[in-house]
Amino acid sequence: MYHPRELYPSLGTGYRLGHPQPGADSTFPPALTEGYRYPDLDTSKLDCFLSGIEAAPHTLAAAAPLPLLPSALGPETAPPPPEALHSLPGVSLSLENQELWKEFSAVGTEMIITKAGRRMFPACRVSVTGLDPEARYLFLLDVVPVDGARYRWQGQHWEPSGKAEPRLPDRVYIHPDSPATGAHWMRQPVSFHRVKLTNSTLDPHGHLILHSMHKYQPRIHLVRATQLCSQHWGGVASFRFPETTFISVTAYQNPRITQLKIAANPFAKGFRENGRNCKRERDARVKRKLRGPEPVATEACGSGDTPGGPCDSTLGGDIRDSDPEQAPTPQEAASASAPPCGGPSAEAYLLHPAAFHGAPSHLPARTPSFAEAPDPGRPAPYSAAFLDLQPGPGGSAYQAAPSVPSFAPHFIQGGPFPLPYPGPGGYLDMGSKPMY
Protein backbone atom coordinates (compact mmCIF):
# COMPACT_ATOMS: atom_id res chain seq x y z
CA MET A 1 0.00 0.00 0.00
CA TYR A 2 1.15 3.53 -0.77
CA HIS A 3 0.28 6.78 0.87
CA PRO A 4 -1.30 9.35 -1.47
CA ARG A 5 1.55 11.77 -0.87
CA GLU A 6 3.98 9.14 -2.21
CA LEU A 7 1.97 8.70 -5.40
CA TYR A 8 1.38 12.43 -5.96
CA PRO A 9 4.31 14.35 -4.52
CA SER A 10 3.27 17.37 -6.52
CA LEU A 11 0.32 17.88 -4.20
CA GLY A 12 2.63 18.66 -1.32
CA THR A 13 2.85 17.27 2.16
CA GLY A 14 -0.53 18.52 3.26
CA TYR A 15 -4.04 18.47 1.92
CA ARG A 16 -6.19 21.51 1.47
CA LEU A 17 -9.16 22.55 -0.56
CA GLY A 18 -8.44 25.39 -2.95
CA HIS A 19 -6.49 26.35 -6.00
CA PRO A 20 -3.00 24.99 -6.66
CA GLN A 21 -0.36 27.29 -5.19
CA PRO A 22 2.53 28.04 -7.54
CA GLY A 23 5.02 28.51 -4.76
CA ALA A 24 4.05 25.43 -2.81
CA ASP A 25 5.88 23.05 -5.08
CA SER A 26 8.86 23.96 -7.21
CA THR A 27 8.17 21.14 -9.64
CA PHE A 28 4.66 22.43 -10.46
CA PRO A 29 4.71 24.55 -13.68
CA PRO A 30 3.48 28.07 -12.96
CA ALA A 31 1.94 28.29 -16.40
CA LEU A 32 -0.53 25.55 -15.53
CA THR A 33 -1.79 27.24 -12.42
CA GLU A 34 -4.55 29.09 -14.22
CA GLY A 35 -5.61 25.93 -16.04
CA TYR A 36 -6.20 24.07 -12.77
CA ARG A 37 -8.14 26.91 -11.22
CA TYR A 38 -11.73 26.04 -10.26
CA PRO A 39 -14.08 28.92 -9.56
CA ASP A 40 -16.23 26.76 -7.30
CA LEU A 41 -13.31 26.36 -4.89
CA ASP A 42 -12.95 30.05 -4.21
CA THR A 43 -12.34 30.81 -0.59
CA SER A 44 -15.30 33.15 -0.41
CA LYS A 45 -17.70 30.33 -1.34
CA LEU A 46 -16.20 27.80 1.06
CA ASP A 47 -15.99 30.00 4.10
CA CYS A 48 -19.60 29.39 5.10
CA PHE A 49 -19.20 25.60 4.92
CA LEU A 50 -15.58 24.94 5.75
CA SER A 51 -14.77 27.74 8.10
CA GLY A 52 -12.76 25.40 10.33
CA ILE A 53 -10.37 24.30 7.59
CA GLU A 54 -7.10 26.15 7.74
CA ALA A 55 -5.27 27.27 4.65
CA ALA A 56 -1.98 25.75 5.76
CA PRO A 57 -1.59 22.02 6.24
CA HIS A 58 -1.78 20.76 9.80
CA THR A 59 -1.64 17.51 11.70
CA LEU A 60 -4.61 15.88 13.33
CA ALA A 61 -4.88 16.33 17.09
CA ALA A 62 -7.15 15.04 19.81
CA ALA A 63 -10.42 16.84 20.28
CA ALA A 64 -10.66 19.28 23.10
CA PRO A 65 -12.34 17.91 26.22
CA LEU A 66 -15.97 18.78 26.72
CA PRO A 67 -16.79 21.32 29.38
CA LEU A 68 -17.85 20.01 32.75
CA LEU A 69 -21.47 20.04 33.85
CA PRO A 70 -22.63 22.97 35.91
CA SER A 71 -22.20 22.54 39.62
CA ALA A 72 -25.92 23.05 40.14
CA LEU A 73 -26.68 19.58 38.74
CA GLY A 74 -24.51 17.86 41.34
CA PRO A 75 -21.99 15.04 40.87
CA GLU A 76 -22.88 12.23 38.45
CA THR A 77 -23.88 8.96 40.20
CA ALA A 78 -22.77 5.57 38.84
CA PRO A 79 -25.57 3.19 37.74
CA PRO A 80 -26.31 0.41 40.21
CA PRO A 81 -25.13 -3.12 39.34
CA PRO A 82 -27.64 -5.46 37.69
CA GLU A 83 -27.80 -7.63 40.82
CA ALA A 84 -29.22 -4.70 42.75
CA LEU A 85 -31.92 -4.07 40.14
CA HIS A 86 -33.11 -7.68 40.01
CA SER A 87 -32.81 -9.43 43.33
CA LEU A 88 -34.96 -11.21 45.87
CA PRO A 89 -33.56 -10.43 49.31
CA GLY A 90 -33.91 -13.16 51.89
CA VAL A 91 -34.52 -15.97 49.37
CA SER A 92 -32.32 -19.05 49.70
CA LEU A 93 -32.15 -22.25 47.68
CA SER A 94 -30.73 -25.61 48.79
CA LEU A 95 -30.01 -28.76 46.78
CA GLU A 96 -32.08 -31.63 48.16
CA ASN A 97 -30.07 -34.48 46.62
CA GLN A 98 -26.73 -32.85 47.30
CA GLU A 99 -25.11 -36.04 48.61
CA LEU A 100 -25.99 -37.92 45.42
CA TRP A 101 -24.59 -35.12 43.28
CA LYS A 102 -21.39 -35.08 45.31
CA GLU A 103 -21.01 -38.83 44.84
CA PHE A 104 -21.20 -38.39 41.07
CA SER A 105 -19.05 -35.26 41.08
CA ALA A 106 -16.23 -37.11 42.86
CA VAL A 107 -16.04 -39.50 39.89
CA GLY A 108 -16.86 -36.99 37.14
CA THR A 109 -20.53 -36.60 36.26
CA GLU A 110 -21.53 -37.45 32.70
CA MET A 111 -24.91 -36.76 31.12
CA ILE A 112 -26.17 -38.59 28.05
CA ILE A 113 -27.53 -36.41 25.24
CA THR A 114 -29.48 -37.86 22.31
CA LYS A 115 -31.30 -36.56 19.28
CA ALA A 116 -34.70 -37.34 20.80
CA GLY A 117 -33.70 -35.96 24.21
CA ARG A 118 -32.61 -37.70 27.41
CA ARG A 119 -33.50 -36.86 31.00
CA MET A 120 -30.85 -35.91 33.51
CA PHE A 121 -29.79 -38.20 36.32
CA PRO A 122 -29.30 -37.06 38.96
CA ALA A 123 -32.00 -34.47 38.46
CA CYS A 124 -31.98 -31.04 40.07
CA ARG A 125 -34.18 -31.16 43.18
CA VAL A 126 -34.19 -28.03 45.32
CA SER A 127 -35.95 -26.50 48.31
CA VAL A 128 -36.64 -22.78 48.56
CA THR A 129 -37.27 -20.55 51.58
CA GLY A 130 -37.87 -16.86 52.15
CA LEU A 131 -40.60 -16.31 49.54
CA ASP A 132 -43.67 -14.19 49.97
CA PRO A 133 -46.50 -16.71 50.51
CA GLU A 134 -49.00 -14.56 48.59
CA ALA A 135 -46.79 -13.48 45.68
CA ARG A 136 -46.44 -15.54 42.52
CA TYR A 137 -43.12 -16.82 41.21
CA LEU A 138 -41.68 -18.63 38.20
CA PHE A 139 -39.07 -21.37 38.44
CA LEU A 140 -36.71 -21.61 35.46
CA LEU A 141 -33.69 -23.76 34.64
CA ASP A 142 -31.05 -23.42 31.95
CA VAL A 143 -27.66 -25.03 31.28
CA VAL A 144 -24.63 -22.86 30.52
CA PRO A 145 -21.03 -23.73 29.54
CA VAL A 146 -18.50 -23.72 32.34
CA ASP A 147 -15.49 -22.83 30.20
CA GLY A 148 -14.41 -22.46 26.58
CA ALA A 149 -12.79 -25.88 26.17
CA ARG A 150 -13.71 -29.16 24.59
CA TYR A 151 -12.91 -32.33 26.55
CA ARG A 152 -11.94 -35.91 25.81
CA TRP A 153 -11.60 -39.06 27.90
CA GLN A 154 -7.91 -39.88 28.03
CA GLY A 155 -6.99 -43.01 29.95
CA GLN A 156 -8.68 -42.64 33.32
CA HIS A 157 -9.52 -38.93 33.39
CA TRP A 158 -10.96 -36.04 31.39
CA GLU A 159 -8.66 -33.47 29.85
CA PRO A 160 -9.15 -30.43 27.56
CA SER A 161 -8.61 -31.21 23.90
CA GLY A 162 -9.20 -27.93 22.13
CA LYS A 163 -11.41 -24.91 21.80
CA ALA A 164 -15.12 -25.23 22.47
CA GLU A 165 -17.69 -25.25 19.68
CA PRO A 166 -19.68 -22.06 19.03
CA ARG A 167 -22.35 -21.55 21.62
CA LEU A 168 -25.74 -22.95 20.70
CA PRO A 169 -29.06 -21.10 21.07
CA ASP A 170 -29.93 -20.58 24.70
CA ARG A 171 -33.08 -22.28 25.90
CA VAL A 172 -34.81 -22.16 29.25
CA TYR A 173 -36.91 -24.86 30.87
CA ILE A 174 -39.97 -23.49 32.67
CA HIS A 175 -41.25 -25.57 35.56
CA PRO A 176 -44.78 -26.80 34.74
CA ASP A 177 -46.16 -25.42 38.03
CA SER A 178 -45.18 -21.86 37.10
CA PRO A 179 -46.50 -19.41 38.01
CA ALA A 180 -47.41 -20.41 41.56
CA THR A 181 -47.54 -18.74 44.94
CA GLY A 182 -44.61 -18.71 47.29
CA ALA A 183 -46.54 -20.94 49.68
CA HIS A 184 -46.82 -23.56 46.94
CA TRP A 185 -43.09 -23.54 46.18
CA MET A 186 -42.10 -23.69 49.85
CA ARG A 187 -44.53 -26.50 50.69
CA GLN A 188 -42.40 -29.26 49.12
CA PRO A 189 -39.16 -29.68 47.15
CA VAL A 190 -39.15 -28.52 43.54
CA SER A 191 -37.98 -31.17 41.07
CA PHE A 192 -36.70 -30.61 37.53
CA HIS A 193 -36.70 -34.30 36.60
CA ARG A 194 -38.50 -33.61 33.29
CA VAL A 195 -35.64 -31.61 31.83
CA LYS A 196 -34.29 -33.27 28.67
CA LEU A 197 -30.94 -32.72 26.98
CA THR A 198 -30.44 -33.07 23.22
CA ASN A 199 -27.70 -32.55 20.65
CA SER A 200 -30.10 -31.76 17.80
CA THR A 201 -29.88 -28.14 16.75
CA LEU A 202 -33.24 -28.50 14.97
CA ASP A 203 -35.05 -29.88 18.01
CA PRO A 204 -38.74 -28.85 17.86
CA HIS A 205 -39.68 -29.98 21.38
CA GLY A 206 -37.95 -27.29 23.39
CA HIS A 207 -35.26 -29.53 24.90
CA LEU A 208 -32.01 -27.93 26.04
CA ILE A 209 -29.45 -28.13 23.20
CA LEU A 210 -25.87 -28.99 24.19
CA HIS A 211 -22.60 -29.89 22.50
CA SER A 212 -21.12 -33.29 23.18
CA MET A 213 -17.82 -33.46 25.13
CA HIS A 214 -18.35 -30.04 26.73
CA LYS A 215 -18.64 -29.12 30.39
CA TYR A 216 -21.89 -27.53 31.54
CA GLN A 217 -23.58 -26.43 34.72
CA PRO A 218 -27.32 -25.99 35.44
CA ARG A 219 -28.62 -22.65 36.68
CA ILE A 220 -31.90 -22.22 38.53
CA HIS A 221 -33.70 -18.89 38.32
CA LEU A 222 -36.50 -17.67 40.54
CA VAL A 223 -38.56 -14.84 39.05
CA ARG A 224 -41.29 -12.91 40.78
CA ALA A 225 -44.03 -12.36 38.21
CA THR A 226 -47.79 -12.68 38.11
CA GLN A 227 -47.87 -14.16 34.60
CA LEU A 228 -45.66 -16.42 32.56
CA CYS A 229 -45.07 -13.81 29.83
CA SER A 230 -45.19 -10.78 32.08
CA GLN A 231 -42.97 -7.80 31.29
CA HIS A 232 -43.09 -6.48 34.83
CA TRP A 233 -40.87 -8.57 37.06
CA GLY A 234 -40.52 -7.86 40.72
CA GLY A 235 -37.11 -9.50 41.09
CA VAL A 236 -34.85 -12.29 39.88
CA ALA A 237 -32.54 -14.57 41.82
CA SER A 238 -30.16 -17.06 40.16
CA PHE A 239 -28.47 -19.98 41.89
CA ARG A 240 -25.66 -22.37 40.95
CA PHE A 241 -24.32 -25.43 42.73
CA PRO A 242 -20.70 -26.46 42.05
CA GLU A 243 -21.45 -30.18 42.45
CA THR A 244 -23.93 -30.15 39.54
CA THR A 245 -21.23 -29.62 36.89
CA PHE A 246 -21.23 -32.36 34.25
CA ILE A 247 -19.79 -33.30 30.86
CA SER A 248 -22.25 -34.04 28.06
CA VAL A 249 -21.58 -37.29 26.18
CA THR A 250 -23.37 -39.52 23.70
CA ALA A 251 -22.09 -42.65 25.49
CA TYR A 252 -20.62 -43.07 28.95
CA GLN A 253 -16.84 -42.89 28.90
CA ASN A 254 -16.04 -43.64 32.54
CA PRO A 255 -16.99 -47.21 33.57
CA ARG A 256 -17.38 -46.06 37.17
CA ILE A 257 -20.09 -43.61 36.13
CA THR A 258 -21.91 -46.42 34.34
CA GLN A 259 -21.91 -48.62 37.43
CA LEU A 260 -22.87 -45.70 39.67
CA LYS A 261 -25.86 -44.77 37.54
CA ILE A 262 -27.03 -48.39 37.37
CA ALA A 263 -26.85 -48.65 41.14
CA ALA A 264 -28.49 -45.29 41.92
CA ASN A 265 -31.03 -44.86 39.12
CA PRO A 266 -34.31 -46.67 39.93
CA PHE A 267 -35.17 -46.81 36.21
CA ALA A 268 -31.96 -48.74 35.41
CA LYS A 269 -32.78 -51.83 37.48
CA GLY A 270 -32.96 -53.92 34.30
CA PHE A 271 -29.23 -53.43 33.78
CA ARG A 272 -28.25 -54.82 37.18
CA GLU A 273 -26.85 -58.29 37.71
CA ASN A 274 -30.25 -59.73 38.57
CA GLY A 275 -32.15 -57.77 35.92
CA ARG A 276 -33.42 -58.76 32.51
CA ASN A 277 -30.97 -56.48 30.72
CA CYS A 278 -27.84 -57.65 32.51
CA LYS A 279 -24.97 -58.80 30.32
CA ARG A 280 -25.66 -62.46 30.94
CA GLU A 281 -29.30 -62.19 29.88
CA ARG A 282 -28.48 -60.05 26.85
CA ASP A 283 -25.90 -62.55 25.62
CA ALA A 284 -28.35 -65.42 26.11
CA ARG A 285 -31.03 -63.62 24.07
CA VAL A 286 -28.56 -62.95 21.26
CA LYS A 287 -27.57 -66.63 21.14
CA ARG A 288 -31.21 -67.72 21.03
CA LYS A 289 -31.90 -65.39 18.11
CA LEU A 290 -28.88 -66.66 16.20
CA ARG A 291 -29.82 -70.28 16.87
CA GLY A 292 -33.35 -69.82 15.56
CA PRO A 293 -36.65 -71.09 16.98
CA GLU A 294 -36.32 -74.26 19.00
CA PRO A 295 -38.44 -77.27 17.85
CA VAL A 296 -41.34 -78.17 20.10
CA ALA A 297 -41.49 -81.86 21.11
CA THR A 298 -45.05 -83.11 20.53
CA GLU A 299 -46.77 -86.48 20.30
CA ALA A 300 -48.83 -87.82 17.44
CA CYS A 301 -52.31 -86.46 17.07
CA GLY A 302 -54.84 -88.41 19.12
CA SER A 303 -52.29 -90.05 21.40
CA GLY A 304 -52.67 -87.60 24.30
CA ASP A 305 -55.41 -87.17 26.80
CA THR A 306 -56.23 -83.64 25.65
CA PRO A 307 -56.10 -82.02 22.22
CA GLY A 308 -52.87 -80.13 21.55
CA GLY A 309 -54.11 -76.75 20.34
CA PRO A 310 -53.70 -73.06 21.10
CA CYS A 311 -56.56 -73.07 23.63
CA ASP A 312 -55.47 -75.98 25.79
CA SER A 313 -55.39 -73.86 28.91
CA THR A 314 -59.11 -73.08 28.60
CA LEU A 315 -60.24 -76.68 28.92
CA GLY A 316 -62.44 -77.24 31.94
CA GLY A 317 -62.40 -81.06 32.04
CA ASP A 318 -66.01 -81.29 33.25
CA ILE A 319 -67.66 -81.84 29.87
CA ARG A 320 -69.35 -85.24 29.44
CA ASP A 321 -71.33 -86.50 26.49
CA SER A 322 -74.73 -88.08 27.13
CA ASP A 323 -73.89 -91.11 24.97
CA PRO A 324 -70.13 -91.75 24.89
CA GLU A 325 -70.56 -94.86 22.77
CA GLN A 326 -72.39 -92.95 20.07
CA ALA A 327 -70.35 -89.70 20.24
CA PRO A 328 -66.63 -90.13 19.59
CA THR A 329 -64.17 -87.99 21.47
CA PRO A 330 -62.47 -85.04 19.73
CA GLN A 331 -59.17 -86.96 19.69
CA GLU A 332 -60.74 -89.91 17.86
CA ALA A 333 -62.42 -87.60 15.38
CA ALA A 334 -59.16 -85.78 14.71
CA SER A 335 -57.10 -88.96 14.37
CA ALA A 336 -59.66 -90.52 12.04
CA SER A 337 -59.92 -87.52 9.70
CA ALA A 338 -56.37 -86.11 9.78
CA PRO A 339 -53.00 -87.67 9.03
CA PRO A 340 -50.28 -87.62 11.68
CA CYS A 341 -49.02 -84.11 12.26
CA GLY A 342 -45.85 -82.81 13.83
CA GLY A 343 -47.03 -79.97 16.05
CA PRO A 344 -50.02 -78.21 17.58
CA SER A 345 -49.99 -75.51 14.93
CA ALA A 346 -50.74 -78.04 12.19
CA GLU A 347 -53.41 -79.69 14.31
CA ALA A 348 -55.12 -76.35 14.77
CA TYR A 349 -55.92 -76.22 11.07
CA LEU A 350 -57.23 -79.83 10.96
CA LEU A 351 -59.50 -79.95 14.02
CA HIS A 352 -63.00 -78.57 14.19
CA PRO A 353 -63.17 -75.31 16.20
CA ALA A 354 -65.35 -76.98 18.81
CA ALA A 355 -62.57 -79.48 19.54
CA PHE A 356 -60.47 -76.71 21.10
CA HIS A 357 -63.21 -76.17 23.68
CA GLY A 358 -63.76 -79.83 24.56
CA ALA A 359 -67.05 -80.13 22.64
CA PRO A 360 -67.84 -82.77 19.98
CA SER A 361 -67.19 -81.62 16.44
CA HIS A 362 -70.51 -83.01 15.09
CA LEU A 363 -74.02 -83.77 16.23
CA PRO A 364 -74.55 -87.08 18.11
CA ALA A 365 -75.23 -90.00 15.80
CA ARG A 366 -78.81 -91.26 15.64
CA THR A 367 -80.41 -94.35 14.21
CA PRO A 368 -82.01 -93.28 10.93
CA SER A 369 -85.62 -94.28 10.25
CA PHE A 370 -85.18 -94.32 6.50
CA ALA A 371 -83.40 -96.57 4.07
CA GLU A 372 -79.59 -96.46 4.18
CA ALA A 373 -79.29 -96.23 0.39
CA PRO A 374 -82.21 -94.39 -1.24
CA ASP A 375 -82.99 -94.81 -4.88
CA PRO A 376 -80.46 -92.75 -6.91
CA GLY A 377 -83.15 -91.78 -9.34
CA ARG A 378 -85.25 -90.07 -6.70
CA PRO A 379 -83.99 -87.20 -4.51
CA ALA A 380 -83.88 -87.92 -0.81
CA PRO A 381 -86.62 -86.28 1.25
CA TYR A 382 -85.75 -83.23 3.30
CA SER A 383 -86.36 -85.02 6.59
CA ALA A 384 -84.01 -87.85 5.63
CA ALA A 385 -81.25 -85.50 4.52
CA PHE A 386 -81.04 -83.23 7.57
CA LEU A 387 -83.28 -84.03 10.56
CA ASP A 388 -84.58 -87.13 12.32
CA LEU A 389 -88.33 -86.43 12.44
CA GLN A 390 -90.78 -88.31 14.64
CA PRO A 391 -94.57 -88.45 14.16
CA GLY A 392 -96.39 -85.81 16.08
CA PRO A 393 -98.98 -86.50 18.74
CA GLY A 394 -102.32 -87.72 17.43
CA GLY A 395 -100.91 -88.56 14.04
CA SER A 396 -100.98 -84.93 12.89
CA ALA A 397 -99.17 -83.88 9.77
CA TYR A 398 -96.84 -81.61 11.76
CA GLN A 399 -93.63 -83.15 12.98
CA ALA A 400 -92.14 -82.74 16.44
CA ALA A 401 -89.20 -80.38 16.91
CA PRO A 402 -85.80 -82.04 17.02
CA SER A 403 -84.16 -82.48 20.38
CA VAL A 404 -81.42 -80.06 21.48
CA PRO A 405 -77.93 -81.55 21.17
CA SER A 406 -76.27 -82.50 24.40
CA PHE A 407 -73.42 -79.99 24.01
CA ALA A 408 -75.64 -76.92 23.62
CA PRO A 409 -75.96 -76.14 27.38
CA HIS A 410 -72.19 -75.91 27.60
CA PHE A 411 -72.18 -72.85 25.30
CA ILE A 412 -75.24 -71.24 26.84
CA GLN A 413 -74.53 -71.49 30.56
CA GLY A 414 -70.89 -70.47 30.61
CA GLY A 415 -67.35 -71.61 30.09
CA PRO A 416 -65.27 -71.33 26.92
CA PHE A 417 -67.23 -70.25 23.87
CA PRO A 418 -66.59 -70.18 20.15
CA LEU A 419 -65.93 -66.75 18.68
CA PRO A 420 -66.84 -64.14 19.75
CA TYR A 421 -65.49 -64.70 23.29
CA PRO A 422 -67.33 -62.99 26.15
CA GLY A 423 -65.67 -60.76 28.69
CA PRO A 424 -64.34 -62.01 32.01
CA GLY A 425 -67.16 -63.44 34.05
CA GLY A 426 -69.66 -62.83 31.25
CA TYR A 427 -72.05 -65.12 29.46
CA LEU A 428 -72.96 -65.38 25.83
CA ASP A 429 -76.73 -65.26 25.27
CA MET A 430 -77.26 -67.69 22.41
CA GLY A 431 -81.09 -67.68 22.52
CA SER A 432 -82.60 -69.33 19.46
CA LYS A 433 -79.69 -68.36 17.16
CA PRO A 434 -77.89 -71.18 15.34
CA MET A 435 -74.68 -72.36 16.95
CA TYR A 436 -72.65 -72.29 13.69
UniProtKB/Swiss-Prot annotation:
GO terms for molecular function: DNA-binding transcription repressor activity, RNA polymerase II-specific; RNA polymerase II cis-regulatory region sequence-specific DNA binding; RNA polymerase II-specific DNA-binding transcription factor binding; transcription corepressor activity. One of its GO terms (biological process) is negative regulation of neuron projection development. Its main location: nucleus. Signal peptide: none annotated. GO terms for cellular component: chromatin; nucleoplasm; nucleus. Residues 332-344 have a biased composition (Low complexity). SMART domains: TBOX. Residues 100-273 bind DNA. It is found in: Nucleus. Disruption phenotype: Defects in the differentiation of paraxial mesoderm. Irregular somites formed in the neck region of mutant embryos, whereas more posterior paraxial tissue did not form somites but instead differentiated along a neural pathway, forming neural-tube-like structures that flanked the axial neural tube. These paraxial tubes showed dorsal/ventral patterning that is characteristic of the neural tube and had differentiated motor neurons. Embryos lacking TBX6 show also randomization of the direction of heart looping and independent alterations in the direction of embryo turning. CDD domains: T-box_TBX6. Residues 274-344, 360-383 are annotated as: Disordered. It comes from the Eukaryota. PROSITE patterns: TBOX_1, TBOX_2, TBOX_3. Pfam families: T-box. PANTHER family: T-BOX PROTEIN-RELATED, T-BOX TRANSCRIPTION FACTOR TBX6. T-box transcription factor that plays an essential role in the determination of the fate of axial stem cells: neural vs mesodermal. Acts in part by down-regulating, a specific enhancer (N1) of SOX2, to inhibit neural development. Seems to play also an essential role in left/right axis determination and acts through effects on Notch signaling around the node as well as through an effect on the morphology and motility of the nodal cilia. This is T-box transcription factor TBX6. It comes from Mus musculus.
